[in-house]
Amino acid sequence: MIYSMTAFARLEVKKDWGDAVWEIRSVNQRYLENFFRLPEQFRGLENTLREKLRQNLTRGKIECSLRIETKKQANAELNLNKELANQVIQSLQWIKAQAGEGEINLTDVLRYPGVVEAQEQDLDAISQDLLTAFDDLLTDFIAMRGREGEKLNDIIQQRLDSIAVETDKVRSQMPAVLQWQRERLLQRFEDAQLNLDPQRVEQEMILLAQRIDVAEELDRLQMHVKETTNILKKGGAVGRKLDFMMQELNRESNTLASKSINADITASAVELKVLIEQMREQIQNLE
């Protein structure tokens, strides 16, 4: 199976401690590049998440986000930071002494950030639940990349089949093209009233045939089509291999176009270049 680099997956998590939503999305990228948007208290998960992605993906710009809402504990214990409370009181007393007026309000002390805090939930347990959910999400994400990859595979294979048809068409036309060019050259000699030695004429014909012969280009096109098909069948991370094959196919189609002396063959060469470009666009999406 081949895999697309473009995909999206989402997973909702509902636990006793609250709710969370994981999302993964990816777009084309030459290499593997990961980005994370995590709540501050769970940033410590980033290295573990990065390793999970590295083990399962090879290319793409991957964005992972986590939104979480923990439930407030009805019977949560309150922790008083006595040291901080004492510092706040001393500061307020100093301000009062400097101002010469005002009273120290106990409510203001208790509202100061960090003086009174509810006991936090077990972050380790929550983190483990989140990692387990991420594994499930990653499985769905990879499956989606695979489904998208199969669609791209079908499109590319259709273009390869069309290239094979055009290649066979040109091959079948070549004997007639060579005969037409031979007759055309002889007619020129005759119109110019040149009395050439038959052996010299035959040599010119051979040289002409060699210049316009595209058998090697057609053979290589056919070979590249087969190799590209084999790469698709093997599956895996095929993007770079297929990109190289497109360069080879494009090189042969350019040579075919440069040797063309017939409108039909020129049209086939143009069609080949269109088909190759269509495949190249799809291959940019493959891992």
Curated annotation (Swiss-Prot):
Cofactor dependence: a divalent metal cation
Q: Which InterPro entries match?
A: YicC-like_C, YicC-like_N, YicC/YloC-like
The UniProt keywords, alphabetically, are: Endonuclease, Hydrolase, Nuclease
GO MF annotation list? RNA endonuclease activity, producing 5'-phosphomonoesters
A Pfam family hit? YicC-like_N
Q: Could you confirm whether the keyword Hydrolase appears in this record?
A: yes
Q: What class of enzyme is it?
A: hydrolase
Q: Is this entry keyworded Nuclease?
A: yes
The EC number(s) given in the record are: 3.1.26.-
One example of a Gene Ontology biological process annotation: RNA catabolic process
As for what it does, the entry says: Probably a ssRNA endonuclease. Might contribute to small RNA (sRNA) regulation.
Q: What family does the database annotate?
A: Belongs to the YicC/YloC family.
Q: Which NCBIfam families match?
A: YicC/YloC family endoribonuclease
Listed name of the protein:
Probable endoribonuclease YicC
Q: Which organism is it from?
A: Haemophilus influenzae (strain ATCC 51907 / DSM 11121 / KW20 / Rd)
Upper lineage: Bacteria, Pseudomonadati, Pseudomonadota, Gammaproteobacteria, Pasteurellales
